[in-house]
Amino acid sequence: MNYKSKFKVVEFIVRSEKSSEWESIINLISNYFPYEISEKTENYLRVHVLIYGSEDVKIIQTLAKQIYGKVMPFGHVRTVIIEY
């Protein structure tokens, strides 16, 4: 059966020693997309968002850069896009 992907789930995985930035990172994401926090610890944050188009992918790329700016040089950001 052929079908076209209608939405994508994006997973932001953030590791950092600066957990004080978690709330500002979540606020940044919430300005653009509804989100769900999958895991939040002192050094690790995993957030999922739902996107629908290629314009959203560009926003995700920009968000990843902004999040990295908040956690560098003590952490890193990984973004995974899962198509459905």
Predicted regions and their residues:
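Short glycine-/aliphatic-rich beta-strand segments at the starts of folded cytosolic domains
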Residues: N2-S16
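Short amphipathic alpha-helix segments
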Residues: I13-P34
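Serine/threonine-rich, low-complexity intrinsically disordered segments
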Residues: R15, N43, G53, I81-Y84
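Short intrinsically disordered terminal tails
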Residues: M1-Y3, E83-Y84
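Short, intrinsically disordered low-complexity segments
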Residues: F33-M72
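A short amphipathic beta-strand at an alpha->beta junction
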Residues: M72-Y84
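Polar/charged side chains located within well-ordered beta-strands of beta-rich proteins
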Residues: E11, R46-H48, T79
